Amino acid sequence: MRCPSCNSLDTQVKDSRPTEDSSVIRRRRVCVTCNFRFTTFERVQLRELTVIKRNGRRVPFDRDKLMRSVQISLRKRSVDPERVEKMVSAIVRELESGGESEVSSEAIGEIVMEHLRDLDDVAYVRFASVYRNFREAKDFEAVLGELSAEDETPRLAPVRK
């Protein structure tokens, strides 16, 4: 692992432990060259994903970019960061287990919107406004109408056997 301070490749792991949900391993490292201490996180990756952009360009999937876009939609919202992390992990897991190594940006956007709808209505509308490229107030009204209609529909409790 390259040291973020001096770019040396000579680093040592001082401590490793799983996170609370055991989906990530947190490693404390120290650079042998400059003694800089830093933390890295290790996640399981089921497969390499390639994103097909709207213009046809193919780019490697970037989990951090997904997290940033979700965090932008959640800005100034009181949502527990752990719930956000779990949601992003669930989205990535869903994409990786989908069976395809290439996924369209539209498909990713729809999955994110589906998860945001369950997490926070305001974040859902914010994300939708960028993802669907809203141009007029009626675009917002349509999405708000979807949310209102969903709220009015009674949800049945799951049947337990």
UniProtKB/Swiss-Prot annotation:
Residues 49-139 form the ATP-cone domain. GO terms for biological process: negative regulation of DNA-templated transcription. Belongs to the NrdR family. The lineage of its organism: Bacteria, Pseudomonadati, Pseudomonadota, Alphaproteobacteria, Hyphomicrobiales. PANTHER family: TRANSCRIPTIONAL REPRESSOR NRDR (PTHR30455:SF2). Residues 1-11 have a biased composition (Polar residues). This is Transcriptional repressor NrdR. InterPro entries: ATP-cone_dom (IPR005144), NrdR-like_N (IPR055173), RNR_NrdR-like (IPR003796). It comes from the Bacteria. A zinc finger (unnamed) spans 3-34. One of its GO terms (molecular function) is ATP binding. Its cofactor is Zn(2+). Negatively regulates transcription of bacterial ribonucleotide reductase nrd genes and operons by binding to NrdR-boxes. Keywords: ATP-binding, DNA-binding, Metal-binding, Nucleotide-binding, Repressor, Transcription, Transcription regulation, Zinc, Zinc-finger. Residues 1-20 are annotated as: Disordered. Binds 1 zinc ion. PROSITE patterns: ATP_CONE.
